[in-house]
Structure formats: C-alpha cells, structure tokens
Swiss-Prot record:
It comes from Bartonella bacilliformis (strain ATCC 35685 / KC583 / Herrer 020/F12,63). Substrate binds at residues 12-14, 175, 214, 235-236. NCBIfam families: tim. This is Triosephosphate isomerase. It holds the Pfam family TIM. It comes from the Bacteria. It catalyses: D-glyceraldehyde 3-phosphate = dihydroxyacetone phosphate. Pathway: Carbohydrate biosynthesis; gluconeogenesis; Carbohydrate degradation; glycolysis; D-glyceraldehyde 3-phosphate from glycerone phosphate: step 1/1. Involved in the gluconeogenesis. Catalyzes stereospecifically the conversion of dihydroxyacetone phosphate (DHAP) to D-glyceraldehyde-3-phosphate (G3P).
Length: 254
C-alpha cells in the first residue's frame, strides 16, 4: 500500500444479481461504518438494471455506486448500450472501463476505452480503468511493454486522482482462482506508478492503483499489503456480503 493514498475496495458484480441480490448490498452497507472506516473507501458496481434501486439503498451510506461500462457517445442510435450520462442519472459515481472481459469478448481497443473514459469524465463520473496482460504475453515476458501501451492508449490527458482509478487485472487471473505472486504485483504496480507519475506529474503520484484478479478473503491480506497497491477490484467475492465485509475487515487491521 501507499500510506498517503486512501485505498478503494471496489466490488464488481458483473452480469450477476437480481432484485433479491440487493439484500447483500444492504448487508454490505450495514457492515461499513462511515466513522470507523475512514481508512478506506468502498464502491460496488452493479448491473445497470439494479442501479436505481441500489442508489436508493446507498443514498445515506458511505459507499459509492458504479456502473460496469458505458458508450463513448452521450446519446444516439446505439441499441442496447448505456451512456455515462444515464449511469450518472441512475445514481452512479463511478464506472468500470476497459475490463478484461470487455477487451476480450468485445474486442475493445485502447482507443475505444480512451473514448469511453472521456465520456465518463464529461458526465462527471470517476473512470476505473482496467489494464492487464494475457497469459501468452506474460510467458513471452512482454508484460511491462503491454501495460505501457495500454496506459498510453487507454488513459487520456487530464487524468487526476479525483477522476481516475487504475486497476491492474492480469487477464489470466480473472475468474480462474490464480493470482500473480506478491513480488510480481509489486513490480507491476511500481511500474504503473512510475509511468503515471512521469506522464501526469503530481496527480500521477495520487491516482489510486488497484489490484484485480481472484481477490478473496483467503488472499486479501497478502495482496493488499503489497507495495504500491491502493486497494482491490473484487469480483466474485463482492457478491456475498460476508466475503466483501471480511476483506474490508482485513483492511481495517492493516
């Protein structure tokens, strides 16, 4: 962790959850105290269908609400898409962009991610930008080159700590139960910090860097104590209040 940066624990529900799942969100909200938990911030990114109701649940809570993607246009003939403005109106303050599943399933390029980030900023949303290498790229020892290109292509000029969060999520670790070693994560996060600091100056020193990829209660302590890690992007473990709150409790003790 970087002690001067307030960490962020971000849950990503992905394409999971119905109205019944909001019970878990209520439990998460009940388990996070705004006075006690000033040592970190919490964010839950739910499916778009749940945003409005989730916003009602979290309206008086110390938890941020996020979307999972947005279009790069503010409106128009884009059937099935959702704009950043719509997310904002539904109660979101953040949006995940460039997630590995979007990059893989929909062939989203760095340029598309960059355009979406700009749309998020226009709407007043914080962009949580994901970058990460494939297993092949890791085996070919091109991880840092890949990440440098993704940072350059996906993060627009104007990134600041109040409008940008960057999550390192190695694609091969998403949903597999596998994670890099803490040494590998520290190396990568140190590299990312160097890159954003060089490009954005003082703001680059303050942008939060999250780790994402099979984060769960059993490995959270080791991951969150790793150098240059300012929080986590949590997938499956954010669907159950007990798991998410266990990770929050681990953070309280660090």
């Amino acid at each position: 962790m970087t002690s001067s940066i307030r960490p962020l624990l971000a849950g990503n529900w992905k394409m999971n959850g119905t109205s019944e799942s909001l019970r878990e969100l209520r439990a998460i909200a009940s388990g996070i105290d705004s006075d006690r938990d000033r040592c970190f911030e919490a964010l839950v990114c739910v499916p778009a269908t749940l945003l409005s109701r989730a916003s009602d649940i979290l309206s008086d809570e110390n938890i941020f609400l996020g979307g999972q993607d947005c279009h790069f246009n503010d409106s128009g003939p884009h059937t099935g898409d959702i704009s950043a403005c719509m997310l904002k109106e539904a109660g979101a303050s953040h949006v995940i962009l460039g997630h590995s599943e979007r990059r893989t399933d929909y062939r989203e390029s760095d340029a598309i991610v960059c355009a979406k980030v700009k749309a998020a900023w226009r709407a007043g949303l914080v962009a949580l930008i994901c970058i990460g290498e494939t297993l092949e790229e890791r085996e070919n020892n091109t991880v840092l080159d890949v990440l440098a290109q993704q940072l350059k292509g996906s993060v627009p000029a104007g990134a600041m700590d109040h409008n940008t969060v960057i999550a390192y999520e190695p694609r091969w670790a998403i949903g597999t139960g596998k994670t890099p070693t803490s040494e590998d994560i520290a190396q990568v996060h140190g590299f990312i910090r160097k890159e954003v600091s060089h490009r954005f100056g003082d703001e680059g020193h303050k942008i939060r860097l999250l780790y994402g990829g099979s984060v769960k209660p059993s490995n959270a302590s080791e991951l969150l104590e790793t150098s240059h890690v300012n929080g986590a992007l949590i997938g499956g473990a954010s669907l159950k209040a007990t798991d998410f709150l266990t990770i929050c409790n681990i953070y309280r003790k660090l």
